[in-house]
Amino acid sequence: MTTENGAVVMRKIFRENLVGIFLLSCIALMANLAIADQANPIVIMKTTDGDITIELFADKSPITVKNFLRYADEGHFDGTVFHRVIPNFMIQGGGFTAVLEEKRTFAPIVNESRNKLHNTRGTVAMARTSDPDSAAAQFFINQRSNLRLDWSPGKDGYTVFGKVTNGMQVVDIIALSDTGPAQAMTARGPSVFQDVPVKPVVILSVSRLSP
């Protein structure tokens, strides 16, 4: 092989390597974009006791997350309170105003607790009645692990659809609120609630940090 032919071969190999590197870079970029598109939504919940950042598990609880974001986007949670607070258990909110009047909701959603996500400390789950498919707007944040609330064969659980990623100290502060009984107005009529914070803990807003 002459020196000239060798140079031609080397240039060809170099060009082929460049093309290969370019193609690999394009594939990697497309993969990263696909991952970004599939990323779970992040919301920030601003309360009178501080901010709570929550990742929503759209990949595991798509119906529940879509429902929660619908309420958030329409401002339903703004001005509602954590109306049920039990230390070493959970804090519940999303359904009542500061004067404990129940807000109107959309139709309830199907229970997704078969996703087998666990009610561990810091997770966010839907509140409901004894009817497993009765969840609407109310949710709770587990202050401790409450695995008895999970789905198991023959028993519907409470659907976990998110997790606190920042602000768990705020949840702990809320859980320590002084509580007592209070008169509430529900959709079914007057009722006395237990475990209501004496000083209302208000959700100022719930907004998206990422889609």
Residue spans of the language-model regions?
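Bacterial N-terminal signal peptides that target proteins for export
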Residues: 4, 9-22
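Bacterial N-terminal signal peptides
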Residues: 19-31
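Cyclophilin-like peptidyl-prolyl cis-trans isomerases
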Residues: 6, 11, 29-211
